A protein has these predicted regions:
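A conserved mid-protein helix/loop that constitutes part of the nucleotide-sugar donor-binding site
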Residues: 13-21, 186-208, 215, 306, ...
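Short hydrophobic beta-strand element within catalytic cores of glycosyltransferases
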Residues: 36-37, 286-289, 299
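Acidic anion/phosphate-binding donor-loop and adjacent secondary structure
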Residues: 63-67, 139-143, 150-151, 158-175, ...
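A conserved, positively charged/aromatic
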Residues: 100-135, 139, 145-147
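Aromatic "clamp/platform" in nucleotide-sugar-dependent glycosyltransferases that forms part
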Residues: 250, 269
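Conserved acidic donor-binding segment of nucleotide-sugar-dependent glycosyltransferases
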Residues: 301-302, 306-313, 322-328
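A short, well-ordered alpha-helix in the C-terminal region of glycosyltransferases
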Residues: 315, 322, 329-344, 353-356
Length: 363
């Protein structure tokens, strides 16, 4: 199949990592994959399997950018594109116009729970399929009544499990070397919805109980003002955690970072899927997550991880303390979590399901 992936993202997050894995995986399977990106896109280095000549860079501010739409339509026609697949909501109307002018089929992936706007309702009726990355996202799409039941398909995000998996020996010990603390980490862009402040307050409680624990927050504040990072830094100082909690910014190699964690926490207030949760589980790191929409689909409490109520700092601190004190439980949760990821959230399963969605619309 000849497939054009469209993405105007300016930064890399979970959705962009998903796109890169999808494009590279489909290319390795023998499909002709193309990518339309904005000139400042950070994605080209991530598309390691996609031929460089298959990547086109065009401004994609909105569907009103007619010149870009016409350029992409010509590109799609000249390259005999069969499937146009868009991943960012602001790109959906543009992708719909390009698909219509080039006679290609239109596939969308929905990564978030936010309602679509009026432009989407007016332009997306002829979408062939919209992929929801979780049951929660699929339910939200149904509630908006833009797409029919036949148009909505559930395909969970998948990851390259082997890239994250590693040996678990020597990690699950109650007592490390004197100079080696236990490490609890979280990964996600700095924003109130991601729950960093709850994580910090829980860290303060745990630090009062144990001296051998340190905490790590990886991620950047994507806002122009940087206000949330400043709030986080202020809270860390107020709780006297400067020596116990590190803000390390954006990390390119997530698998390497996860290999340094003894526990992973996802304290989000809302999470449509939870790619970082799946990555941590694949890496064999026991996970504690708030019972957000996506986390409830991924984790069975006390079987493949721990779930705690959203916003309950005391419960989060208790879960962290409990797992740090019980190495046997950490090891059991880790093994079950890795098994769960291989069964349900592997890259191969995602590629199989996406290929099937493509084939269905081409029939």
């Amino acid at each position: 199949m000849r497939i054009l992936q469209i993405c105007s993202a300016r930064q890399i997050g979970g959705g962009e990592r998903h796109l890169a894995d999808l494009a590279n995986g489909l290319t390795r399977r023998g499909h002709d994959v193309f990518a339309a990106l904005i000139p400042s896109s950070p994605l080209p280095p991530e598309l390691s399997s996609v031929p460089k000549q298959n990547i086109v860079q065009v401004p994609m501010r909105s569907v009103l950018n007619v010149s870009s739409a016409l350029k992409l339509a010509r590109f799609a026609s000249e390259n005999r594109i069969q499937i146009i697949h868009a991943h960012v909501a602001r790109d959906y109307p543009l992708a719909a116009l390009v698909a219509r002018r080039s006679s290609a089929h239109l596939i969308l992936t929905r990564h978030v729970l936010f309602p679509m706007n009026r432009a989407h309702k007016l332009t997306l009726r002829r979408t062939d399929r919209i992929i929801a990355v979780s049951q929660a996202v699929a339910d939200e799409l149904r509630s908006q009544r833009i797409f029919s039941e036949d148009q909505i398909v559930l395909i969970h995000n998948g990851i390259d499990v082997d890239r994250f998996a590693r040996g678990r020996e020597d990690r699950f010990t109650n007592n490390k070397d004197a100079d080696q603390n236990l490490r609890v980490g979280m990964i996600g862009h700095l924003a109130p919805i991601k729950g960093q402040e709850d994580f910090i307050r829980a860290a303060a409680i745990v630090c009062r109980r144990r001296r051998d624990v340190e905490f790590v927050i990886a991620g950047e504040d994507k806002s122009r003002s940087g206000e949330h990072r400043r709030r986080i830094e202020t809270l860390i100082a107020e709780l006297n955690l400067e020596q116990r909690l590190s803000l390390i910014g954006w990390v390119d190699d997530v698998a390497k970072l996860l290999s340094k964690f003894d526990l992973f926490d996802s304290p989000s207030r809302s999470e449509p899927f939870g790619l970082s949760i799946v990555e941590a589980m694949a890496a064999g790191v026991p996970v504690i997550a708030t019972a957000s929409e996506g986390a409830r689909e991924i984790i069975d409490d006390r079987q493949t991880g721990r779930l705690v109520p959203i916003g309950d700092v005391e419960a989060l601190a208790e879960a962290i303390s409990g797992l740090l004190a019980d190495c046997e439980l950490r090891e059991r949760l880790s093994a079950e979590a890795q098994r769960r990821v291989r069964e349900r959230f592997s890259l191969e399963r995602m590629l199989d399901a996406t290929e099937e969605a493509y084939r269905e619309v081409l029939q």
